[in-house]
């Protein structure tokens, strides 16, 4: 078995006959290959970010998080179809100027998302429970998705135009969510927090616990995890939306997280290249 990317190559002898668990071995082999590429970069990013953080006063750190929150809110909203421009978003969140002739729903959800993000970065980072997730959803969508905000969906959902991808059936939503949150709670450091955030993102989207708003909640989860373990936060930009969704969809179609993991880790490293 052999895998090559650029100048990097990894080989493994499996014997004269193909093992019965060949598919699992392939995944483990690929993960080993990519960990050898990612982990040194992630470690360096973490170390240099920590060193930088020690020189920044807490008041400036909070200000930096709040500034990040503006761009994070704009992009996470835009990915989901918001019509507010970046300037609209900045005017709304910095100056309190409501955009003219723009969707009231987009405006409310933008404000609520930003307020929640700022609250999170200014609060003690607690254990994430099912109630945490439901409360986040209610905070953002309480005024725009009345009757559904803060509640697990009671109907099956899929992707319009793609009947090959099915999200979690209703009876399995809560058990799978609790299993995922338990994985998060029992994190043992064997993988980096960045990879943990990616896995949580992938699994949460596959569960798809809400009728709408899953993407925004999962991207909040990603940054909550990174914040908790003192890593640089993750900004997935709207301009990269196509590649983001394509990698996620490929993993869903093949029931193999490796494709999304590759995209996510490379994207995170690229976004933090100033620390390399």
Please identify what each model-predicted range represents.
Residues 2-212, 216-276:
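FIC/Doc superfamily catalytic core
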């Amino acid at each position: 078995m052999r895998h090559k990317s650029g100048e990097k190559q990894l080989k493994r002898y499996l014997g004269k006959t193909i093992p019965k668990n060949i598919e699992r071995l392939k995944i483990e082999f690929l993960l080993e290959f990519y960990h050898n590429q990612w982990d040194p970069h992630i470690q360096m990013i973490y170390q240099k970010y920590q060193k930088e953080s020690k020189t920044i006063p807490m008041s400036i750190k909070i200000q930096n998080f709040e500034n990040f929150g503006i761009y994070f809110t704009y992009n996470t909203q835009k990915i989901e179809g918001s019509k507010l421009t970046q300037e609209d978003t900045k005017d709304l969140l910095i100056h309190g100027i409501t955009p003219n002739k723009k969707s009231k729903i987009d405006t409310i959800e933008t404000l609520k998302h930003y307020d929640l993000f700022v609250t999170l970065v200014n609060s003690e980072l607690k254990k994430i429970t099912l109630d945490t997730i439901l409360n986040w959803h209610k905070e953002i969508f309480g005024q725009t998705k009345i009757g559904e905000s803060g509640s697990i969906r009671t109907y099956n959902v899929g992707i319009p135009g793609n009947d090959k991808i099915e999200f979690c059936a209703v009876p399995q939503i809560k058990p799978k969510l609790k299993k995922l949150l338990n994985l998060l709670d029992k994190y043992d450091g064997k993988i980096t927090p960045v990879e943990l955030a990616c896995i949580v993102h992938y699994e949460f989207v596959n569960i798809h616990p809400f009728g709408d708003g899953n993407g925004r909640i999962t991207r909040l989860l990603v940054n909550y995890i990174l914040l908790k373990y003192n890593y640089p936060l993750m900004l997935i930009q709207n301009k990269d939306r196509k590649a983001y969704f394509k990698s996620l969809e490929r993993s869903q179609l093949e029931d193999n997280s490796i494709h999304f993991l590759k995209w996510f880790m490379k994207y995170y490293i690229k976004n933090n290249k100033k620390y390399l």
